[in-house]
Amino acid sequence: MKPRTYAVVDIETTGTNPKEDRIIQFGCVMIESGRITSRFSIDIHPGRKISKQIQHLTGITNQRVQKAPYFEDVAQTIYNLLADTIFVAHNIYFDYNFLNHELMRCGLPSLKIPGIDTVELAQIFLPTEPSFRLADLSESLGFIHENPHQADSDAEVTGQLLLLIEERMRKLPIITLEQIARLSRHTGMDTSRFIYHVLEEMKEKPEPLDPSLEIVDGLALQKKEVELFTSVHYGERTYPRKKQAKEKMFGKTLMYRKEQNRLMN
C-alpha cells in the first residue's frame, strides 16, 4: 500500500448529519516509519450555535470558537494536508464521509485516498477487549487520553492505537497473519490492504517460529505438554499390603478396589 504516510484524523461536529451539521474541531497526527512525526489541530467556527449537549460532550464552547476560522477558510489547508496520505480514523466511516461532504460544500474535490478503520483492526487484533470505544480502549491499554471527545486528543490516541496494533500484528506467526489477511477481505475501505501490507513486509524479513509454537494443519498452535501420569513422592517406605495402610498412603489419589489390591499384593 502506498503512500506510507498515515494521517490519523478525528473531527468534532455539531451533530451527526453532514447535510445539516458542521465541523467544530479538526485533529490529525502524521505517522511515518512506525512513529508519530507531526501533529495538527484547529478549532473551527461552525457558523451556528453549538448545542449544550455537544458543549458538554466535547468541552468546546461557543465562546471558544467565536474567533476561530470557518471551515471555508481552512478547507484547502486540510485538503492539502491529507492529500497523498492514508486516512486513518476510529470509525472511519463517520470522519471520512463527513469531512468529504464539507470539502465538497466548499468547492473542493472529495478525498480519493485509502482509508483504514482502527475499530475493525482492534476487533481483529485485540479480540479480548470488553469494549472498542476509543475511551475504553485507551484506559484498558494505558494510553494517556487527556481530553476525550476533543479532536486533537482523540487523534493522538488513535495514532497510538494504530502503532500498538501494528506491533501486535508483527509478533504473530506469518502463517497466522496470512489467514487473518484472507478473512479480512470482508472489512471496510482499505483496512484489509493495510493487513496485507504488513504481511508482505514480514515476509521480506521472516522471523523464526517461536519455539513454544508448532504448525498443525496450517495453524500455529501452542505446544501442549501432556503429562501422562502424576508422580507422587512418598519417601522411602515399604509397600503397604493392608487396605487401611494403602488408603493412608495414597489418600484420594487412587480408588481402592479389592481385586486390584489382590493383584498388586
Predicted regions and their residues:
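Conserved pre-motif I regulatory segment
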Residues: S231-N265
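Acidic two-metal-ion nuclease catalytic site recognized across multiple nuclease folds
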Residues: K2, L164-K242
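Acidic, divalent-metal-coordinating active-site segment for phosphoryl/phosphodiester hydrolysis
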Residues: Q150-I165
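Conserved non-catalytic scaffold segment of RNase H-like nuclease domains
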Residues: M1-G115, P127-H149
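Residues on a specific face of well-ordered alpha-helices
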Residues: E120, F132-D136, E156-Q160
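Phosphodiester-processing cores and adjacent nucleic acid-binding clamps
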Residues: L103, E120-Q123
